[in-house]
Amino acid sequence: MNFENKEIKLETKKTILFKNIVELYLRTGKPIGSKFLVEQDYGLGKSSATIRNMMHEFEEIGLLEKSHISSGRIPSTLGLKYYVKYLANSEDSDLKKQLKKLFFQRKLTIDETIELAAKSISEIVGLTMVTSTENSFETLKSIQLVLLDKNESIIIIVLSSGKVISKKLAMKDSIVLDDLRIAVRIFKERLIDTKVSELHEKTLALKPILKISIQNYEDILQEFIINIFDFEVSQTNNVYGKKNIILARDIKREDLTKIIKLIESTSIWQTIEDNLEEEENIKIEIRPDNSSFLSKKISIDNKIREISVVGSKKMDYAKAKSALMLIEDLVEENKKKEKGNNEDNEE
């Protein structure tokens, strides 16, 4: 995350204080004052004046901001991002135990693991979880020609997701059956394992090869580009625990409608305008409508799955971060099991 091009480093005492300020604010929803912090006794051994000065420093570097309703301070958007990145505890042992128990000795695919984990976490912790996938990462695994009659044939396509697609192809006068068979054979040789999002480009690149073997190659080429390989990139989202975001008190109803529409149909990862550093893999956005998004991508073979947590600005970020990390851990464990099973089968 790019903290407005600032290198923010807090010493231990200040880190403890700032962490407690944020967590108190998230728990109470109220501005935090120095007197209240002294009364809480976090073992800082500081007077109200000293804590007030430290809070003023936090304000100067943009981590805190003044509240409009009291003399206390509240975390800024920058402060909340800093907390999530560096201070929110992403290790929830209780949640981890519950999930381990749930998945013990269950044979699930990686996709099933992600969906069940997201659903379970939303129920256990009370978070709104969103899982997303798009077909642009799917690849062509098989293409077959089936002749119905002299005027019509069917092209059967199998994608890496297991999805089978049948498309009719009209046998125009300019398209000879033998030429069509040659074209399909070339496509099998050259396009298998190509991403669906790249099929148009890769098919056009075969023009010189088709030209050598097929008389009316342009008609066949256009037929496949326009009618057969016309895959639209689509986003599929599953939302779990939707009621949790609906019941958030600090999000206005008119904003909620827009948020629900967004999380049901859009890539949250792509929605978040955040500069991600190479070593980071969680995006966070604190939005003007008082909602917050945390999103993570997980690579699974030839596709990317996206997992997100959606809540109010005052949601429990530690649990949200923990949820994302736990799902990634479960996926990694599932990968190891699948690899072990494949090796056993080979023996």
UniProtKB/Swiss-Prot annotation:
Annotated keywords: Repressor, Stress response, Transcription, Transcription regulation
A Pfam family matched in the record: HrcA
Domain of life: Bacteria
Record GO biological process: negative regulation of DNA-templated transcription
A GO term for molecular function: DNA binding
Gene3D superfamilies registered for this protein in UniProt: Winged helix-like DNA-binding domain superfamily/Winged helix DNA-binding domain
SUPFAM superfamilies: GAF domain-like, Winged helix' DNA-binding domain
Family indicated by similarity: Belongs to the HrcA family.
Function comment: Negative regulator of class I heat shock genes (grpE-dnaK-dnaJ and groELS operons). Prevents heat-shock induction of these operons.
Name by which UniProt lists this protein: Heat-inducible transcription repressor HrcA
